[in-house]
Amino acid sequence: TLCRHDLPIICYSDYKDNKITKAFYGRILIEKAAAFLFYRKEGKTKDLIHALKYKGHQQIGTFIGDWFGVILKDSNEFKDIDCIIPVPLHPKKQKQRGYNQLTTFGLSLSKHLNKPYITNVLIRTSASKTQTFKQRFERFSNNDTKFSIADISSLKNKHILLIDDVITTGATLESCCKELLIAENIKISIVTMAYTE
């Protein structure tokens, strides 16, 4: 059984000048960013995320979301968000997998932050091959993922909390943000389950 004390918690959330926020400097404009766990090539976090994504263990998303949600609620950094939006799966991949691995994580954050979890605004329009076994450079150079917005007017004047499972290069989140930033007077913050150094 997995003990909470075995997990490599980083929890960058209480200050803006953190490694995750810095990872997006000069790439996209975000308000703030936070992640809960370190993701290493071999380790507990990798096992958890793999079980969540490929083994159907959606309770892992709830577990991480509940734990991190309490921390984020107590932090002053994310009190002004308006809604939570997940990085979407392509419909074909979601049908194949049967679920989006971010759903339980997002719903748990929604419960603790008391903000709506919205899944029908950001749409993935191209299916990408799994990134799981690619090296960091391969992930960055091969990122041709495309997104679109279903209802851009609904994002006007909103502060969006964009969520994902793992930040490796940040390329997928960057693609999402570029699309979201088309909306008028929008602000974006990012929260993920894990971060790869």
What is each PLM-predicted segment?
Residues T1-E197:
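Glycine-rich phosphate/pyrophosphate-handling loop used in enzymes and phosphotransfer proteins
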